[in-house]
């Protein structure tokens, strides 16, 4: 199983091409992240008045919350050029040098997954961010020489889902750190309604709410669900997407009222029925579901923990009362000693 095989995956899908049309073009159109938006607007306005490059910006947050969209909006609001790449694509220092030397004054360079830059590339990036210079070594051995190249004053916008993997020297060079949070149901409802208008699809308030509450707090998922529900509505010749149409479509897509899909429910049900609600080790769950451990930890569990359905304890995974209620199952009585609060399980 991969993230790309799940409609509720926050990572970008190959078929998310329609997502571009739904993206806001200005900060005033961007819904959610109120404080982050307000601060960015102030920093952008100040940089424009001074006719200076904006300080380097770091967007931190889970996938699908709008980091790339905000980076594009920043460049648009500043009225400057925008270049985009990602950490894994910049394989060597020469690749980064080619990008930086082609930037115009005050341009924005966006690096997605910036935590995946190699150490060698990072070393070249430090003086570029701080002094707007490139320090390159030309040649090899005794003939090698150091060359300094002056760069246009640019703005680096980095995005990461794993802030803990950033090195301290890189993190400290960003003057404007911005953390993005999951969206509220009301915010997602507005995003879905706006998306429906952009797609020229009829949408009732309760239809937008039905999609929003299953979108896992993530605009990218909301947009993807909207496009799929639109397909069902058009196939059924529905005049508009109301709650009944949305509920039918999302039910057919196996996305339940809490935004859980078939894999989420299979995971929870296996712990509930086969292991008495836990605790059970992650290696045991990987074997029971025929999934690699990484898929369990990185793809399935994060949202279940966020929703309060699952606890990671020293002895393994443990379902909460909330999970049993959602599954419609009776929670077994458990001895506190079995709750996973004590002891250590080698495959936790």
Curated annotation (Swiss-Prot):
Residues 329-348 are annotated as: Disordered. It comes from the Bacteria. It holds the Pfam family AAA_lid_4. GO terms for molecular function: ATP binding; ATP hydrolysis activity; four-way junction DNA binding; four-way junction helicase activity. SMART domains: AAA. Residues 184-254 are annotated as: Small ATPAse domain (RuvB-S). Signal peptide: none annotated. InterPro entries: AAA+_ATPase, AAA_lid_4, DNA_helicase_Holl-junc_RuvB, P-loop_NTPase, RuvB-like_N, RuvB_C, WH-like_DNA-bd_sf, WH_DNA-bd_sf. The keyword Repressor does not apply. It catalyses: ATP + H2O = ADP + phosphate + H(+). Residues 257-348 are annotated as: Head domain (RuvB-H). Its EC number is 3.6.4.-. Residues 1-183 are annotated as: Large ATPase domain (RuvB-L). DNA binds at residues 293, 312, 317. GO terms for cellular component: cytoplasm; Holliday junction resolvase complex. GO terms for biological process: DNA recombination; DNA repair. Belongs to the RuvB family. Homohexamer. Forms an RuvA(8)-RuvB(12)-Holliday junction (HJ) complex. HJ DNA is sandwiched between 2 RuvA tetramers; dsDNA enters through RuvA and exits via RuvB. An RuvB hexamer assembles on each DNA strand where it exits the tetramer. Each RuvB hexamer is contacted by two RuvA subunits (via domain III) on 2 adjacent RuvB subunits; this complex drives branch migration. In the full resolvosome a probable DNA-RuvA(4)-RuvB(12)-RuvC(2) complex forms which resolves the HJ. This is Holliday junction branch migration complex subunit RuvB. It comes from Nitrobacter winogradskyi (strain ATCC 25391 / DSM 10237 / CIP 104748 / NCIMB 11846 / Nb-255).
């Amino acid at each position: 199983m991969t993230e790309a095989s799940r409609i509720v995956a926050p990572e970008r899908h190959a078929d998310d091409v329609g997502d571009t049309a739904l993206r806001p073009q200005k900060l005033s159109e961007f819904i959610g992240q109120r404080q982050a938006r307000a601060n960015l607007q102030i920093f952008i306005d100040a940089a424009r008045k001074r006719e200076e490059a904006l300080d380097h910006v770091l967007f931190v947050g889970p996938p699908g919350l709008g980091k790339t969209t905000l980076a594009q909006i920043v460049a648009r609001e500043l009225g400057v050029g925008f270049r985009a790449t990602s950490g894994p694509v910049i394989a060597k220092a020469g690749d980064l040098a080619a990008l930086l030397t082609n930037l115009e004054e005050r341009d924005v360079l966006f690096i997605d997954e910036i935590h995946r830059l190699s150490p060698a590339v990072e070393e070249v990036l430090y003086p570029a961010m701080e002094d707007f210079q490139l320090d390159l070594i030309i040649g090899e051995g005794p003939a090698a020489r150091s060359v300094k190249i002056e760069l246009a004053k640019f703005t680096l916008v980095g995005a990461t889902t794993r802030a803990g993997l950033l090195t301290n020297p890189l993190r400290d060079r960003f003057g404007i750190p911005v953390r993005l949070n999951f969206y509220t149901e009301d915010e997602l409802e507005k995003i879905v309604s706006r998306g429906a208008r952009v797609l020229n699809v009829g949408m009732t308030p309760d239809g937008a709410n039905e999609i929003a509450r299953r979108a896992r707090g993530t605009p990218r998922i909301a947009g993807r669900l909207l496009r799929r529900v639109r397909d069902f509505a058009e196939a059924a010749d529905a005049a508009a997407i109301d709650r009944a149409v949305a509920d039918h479509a999302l039910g057919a897509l196996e996305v339940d009222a809490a935004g859980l899909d078939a894999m989420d429910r299979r995971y929870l049900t296996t712990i509930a029925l086969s292991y008495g609600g836990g605790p059970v080790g992650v290696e045991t769950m990987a074997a029971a579901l025929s999934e690699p451990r990484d898929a369990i930890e990185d793809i399935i569990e994060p949202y279940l923990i966020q929703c309060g359905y699952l606890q990671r304890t020293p002895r393994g995974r443990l379902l909460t009362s909330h999970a049993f209620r959602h599954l419609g199952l009776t929670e077994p009585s458990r001895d506190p000693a079995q709750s996973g609060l004590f002891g250590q399980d080698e495959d936790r």
